[in-house]
Amino acid sequence: MKITVEDIIKDLELEVLVQGEKDKEIKTSDINRPGLQFAGFYSYFANSRVQVIGNAEWSFLKNMPVELIRKRMKKFFEFDTPCIIIARDLEPHPQLIKNAKLHKRWVLRSKLLTTKVVTKLMNYLDAKLAPETRMHGVLVDVYGIGMLITGESGIGKSETALELIKRGHRLVADDAVDIKEIDGVLRGTSPYITSGMLEVRGMGIIDIPALYGLSSVLQKKTIHLVIYLEQWKPDRNYDRLGIDDDFLEILNVPVKKLTVPIRPGRNLAVIIEAAAANYRYGLMCKVSPVETINNRMESMVRNESKR
């Protein structure tokens, strides 16, 4: 996703002191504090990052001789930077403003503390610049676990989600799920147009918040499990013990995948609830049900051998 300086001005409510180039793009979420550059160090300068000036940099410039400030500002603005943000509502040095206008560089100001500006800006840019993809499926929150239900078109994903919503769980997205990877974590959301809507074949589109209340939907959710629905295949050996873990890679992040075969009489909503509960159990307990059975069998064998 392309992010420009104009975007952060609007979204982060920044004051414009000097207007720079139109549609100036920000390509990284990393931030630079240019104190070393103001001291004359340019062996390494991350000029492609947003430059944030706080109290330390401001005080350093303030106590510098006028002629030296002029030289340092001239050198600093020879490098192309996306923008400069001055925190704490500080008054910029006249030489900074003069050189910014000369080189058409954005200079912005925030009333927030420097650490708040840096944190807010990095979180914003991380979210906006994160790798993203769109997948076909339904994302629901079941017992606090993000379940991405996938499968062929018409397999019953939306109908299963509707049953889960009826049972008190929450819908995040239906049909199309927008997924972003931030620090190795996958977060799913709904496209704006279909947000809160669920399509059920034979009925059409259902407004979930209108029918089940605002608590029945979520704006975004971390994806913990992928449930793949498929028609029962008699010639396939399905995992009956849960020993073999299967994973689906989304944006280079492996997500545990469960394949659930469909045939008459199977209650998919109950199965998905059990999968979510079992996942939570696995997070809290180190011993899996399979290991418990193995331990019981070993104990039984030992007891038999003692007789």
From Swiss-Prot:
Stretches assigned to coiled coil: none
InterPro entries: HPr(Ser)_kin/Pase, Hpr_kin/Pase_C, Hpr_kin/Pase_Hpr_N, P-loop_NTPase, Ser_kin/Pase_Hpr-like_N_sf
Key words of the record: ATP-binding, Carbohydrate metabolism, Kinase, Magnesium, Metal-binding, Multifunctional enzyme, Nucleotide-binding, Serine/threonine-protein kinase, Transferase
Important for the catalytic mechanism of both phosphorylation and dephosphorylation: region residues: 198-207
Source organism of this protein record: Clostridium novyi (strain NT)
A GO term for molecular function: phosphorelay sensor kinase activity
Name of protein: HPr kinase/phosphorylase
Remarks, miscellaneous: Both phosphorylation and phosphorolysis are carried out by the same active site and suggest a common mechanism for both reactions.
Required cofactor names: Mg(2+)
